[in-house]
């Protein structure tokens, strides 16, 4: 009996030891121990879309934890709501459940209210929202109170490009619309391409009899989609000769509205449009607007699928193009610490190599040749991002 009791105790102790080893290993490997013991600084960030995979990347977060002792919490926000809703965690169903319930009952809260869960930083996915947040809120338009901005800037960048196919690009080269330089394809006459679309030219008019219908570049809807708005901002800049002014915007909006109408059906998200481009091929989507990062992300996440289509794919760089810049806005010292960390060279390399973001980090070495497609080392021909009021006028006119 005593022998059995000792054996049972031994088994229990052995099991407890195994569990303890597993727990210790888990905490060590995942840096959870540092979080639980307070060795990591938790930083809360209101975050726009388009960079979720990068922010969740295991290697990125390991650098943040190991090198900078940061546990970053990125809450998902739409860009527009960062202006109109109180920038507190409770606005997106996080933080204090008591305050969430009271907000649901109609009670109003702001960043100045007692007990709310505040943010250390804002990470928008569009520069116009970064620039606009730094201004005083327009209370008459229903804008919410804002944090004091301590620092910030452009952190992740990717240019607008047009994805197409070999046969289409060959035809555009013959039309003197596209030029190839060192294996990179540039749309050197965007005005001519815009005119072709406005004139209703057909694909068959440029020697592509296998394609049905009029020449078109598919995009997301600028009225409801930030990428679509960025693209139409580029078109407006091109039509305005590179400099949008109060006078020429009114002259060019009717032409842009005509372009918008002729574009027909539009996808809701760039991810849906890019997937359709890949799945339906040249017959379904001869040309689409997207970000440069999408193809690099696809090449890394789905190498087998990428290898099947890469010989037929062409990336066209409009000259000029426009940057889509994800901007980091610092509200607190903790936010400043994360901002510094995101400018780390190693994190910058991951941002480019795995997700296609250009960070502009000094010392960053981008091996564009490794992608196997025509991607330029640097992009110099760009237009300035439009201000919020210009975008608002553009979008209102298109509705």
Language-model features and meaning:
Residues 2-25, 331-399:
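Extracellular/periplasmic juxtamembrane helices and adjacent flexible linkers that interface
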Residues 161-168, 221, 323-338, 350-353:
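A bilobed periplasmic-binding-protein/Venus flytrap-type ligand-binding module shared by bacterial periplasmic
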Residues 133-150, 298-316:
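Ligand-binding "clamshell"
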Residues 153-162, 253-263, 268, 306-334:
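Periplasmic-binding protein-like
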Residues 138-223:
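A conserved helix-loop-strand patch within extracytoplasmic ligand-binding domains
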Residues 230-314:
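Ligand-binding pocket segment of bilobal, Venus flytrap-like solute-binding proteins
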Residues 168-173, 224, 240-245, 333-337:
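Short helix-loop capping/hinge motifs at secondary-structure junctions, enriched
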Residues 24-140, 146-148, 291, 296:
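Early extracytoplasmic/lumenal segment of secretory-pathway proteins
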């Amino acid at each position: 009996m005593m022998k059995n009791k000792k054996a049972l105790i031994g088994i229990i102790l052995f099991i407890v030891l195994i569990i303890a080893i597993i727990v210790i290993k888990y905490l060590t490997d995942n840096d959870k121990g540092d979080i639980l013991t307070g060795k990591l600084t938790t930083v809360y960030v209101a975050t726009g879309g388009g960079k979720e995979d990068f922010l969740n990347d295991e290697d990125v977060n390991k650098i943040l934890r190991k090198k900078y002792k940061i546990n970053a919490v990125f809450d998902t926000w739409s860009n527009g709501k960062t202006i109109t809703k109180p920038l507190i965690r409770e606005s997106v169903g996080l933080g204090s459940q008591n305050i969430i319930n009271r907000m649901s009952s109609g009670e109003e809260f702001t960043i100045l209210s007692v007990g709310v869960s505040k943010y250390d930083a804002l990470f928008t996915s569009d520069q116009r929202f970064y620039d606009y947040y730094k201004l005083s809120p327009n209370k008459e338009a229903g804008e919410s109170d804002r944090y004091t901005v301590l620092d910030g800037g452009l952190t992740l960048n990717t240019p607008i490009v047009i994805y197409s196919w070999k046969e289409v690009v060959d035809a555009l080269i013959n039309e003197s619309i596209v030029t190839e330089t060192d294996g990179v394809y540039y749309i050197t006459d965007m005005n001519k391409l815009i005119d072709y679309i406005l004139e209703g030219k057909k694909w068959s008019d440029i020697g592509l009899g296998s394609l049905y219908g009029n020449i078109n570049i598919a995009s997301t809807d600028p009225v409801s989609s930030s990428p679509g708005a960025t693209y139409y901002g580029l078109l407006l800049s091109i039509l305005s000769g590179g400099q949008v002014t109060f006078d020429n915007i009114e002259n060019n909006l009717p032409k842009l509205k005509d372009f918008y109408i002729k574009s027909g059906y539009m996808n809701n998200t760039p991810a849906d449009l890019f997937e359709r481009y890949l799945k339906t091929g040249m017959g379904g989507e001869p040309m689409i607007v997207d970000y440069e990062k999408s193809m690099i992300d696809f090449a890394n996440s789905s190498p087998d699928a990428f290898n099947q289509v890469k010989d037929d794919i062409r990336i066209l760089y409009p000259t000029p193009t426009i940057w889509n810049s994800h901007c980091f806005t610092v509200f607190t010292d903790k936010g400043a610490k994360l901002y510094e960390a995101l400018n780390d060279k190693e994190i910058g390399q991951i941002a480019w190599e795995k997700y296609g973001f250009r960070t502009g980090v000094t010392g960053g070495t981008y091996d564009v040749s490794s992608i196997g497609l025509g991607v330029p080392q640097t992009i110099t021909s760009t237009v300035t991002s439009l201000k919020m009021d210009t975008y608002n006028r553009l979008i209102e006119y298109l509705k």
